[in-house]
Amino acid sequence: VTDDWYVDITTAKLIDPARRKDFKVFVLPNLYGDIITDEAAEFQGGVGTAGSANIGKKYAMFEAVHGSAPRMIKEGRGQYADPCSMLRASVMLLSHIGFQKQANALEAALDKCMLEEKKLVITGRADGCTCSEFGDYVMETITQMTK
C-alpha cells in the first residue's frame, strides 16, 4: 500500500507515537529525505548513531546519516566524531550482502557498548572518548561475545 503525503504533515505524524508505526518506507527527494531521516534518527539516539542505506535495483550504498562531520574537523575535534552511525550502516551492509551472523554480532556489540555497559562515552569533545577508542571497545566486545 502506498500513500502520498506532504512533507510538513509527514514530519508532524512521525513524532506522533500513535501514527509513527504506520511508516515503513519513505521514497523522497534528497532534501526531504535528509529532513525525515534526521528527525527519525532522534528516536534511536540521534544522527550521530543512525546508519543509512540507499538500496536500488542494482546498487546499494551505506553511510553515516550525519555525513563526514566537517564542522568537527574545522574545529579540531575530528578524533572525537561518533563512529556509531557508520558502524550501524556497516550492520546494514553486512546484512544486505548476506553476512547476517557478522551483522548480528556487530549490532549486539553496539547495543552492549552504547546502551548497556557504557564504559566509554562519546561526547564529541575532549571530555569523551575518541572515535578510535570507541571502535576498539566495540571490537573487544565482539571478540568477548563470540568466544
Feature-to-residue mapping (PLM):
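Glycine-rich phosphate/diphosphate-binding loop of Rossmann-like nucleotide-binding domains
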Residues: V1-T10, D22
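Glycine-rich phosphate/nucleotide-binding loop
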Residues: K13-A105, A109-E117
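Glycine-rich phosphate/pyrophosphate-binding loop and the adjoining helix
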Residues: Q100, A109-K147
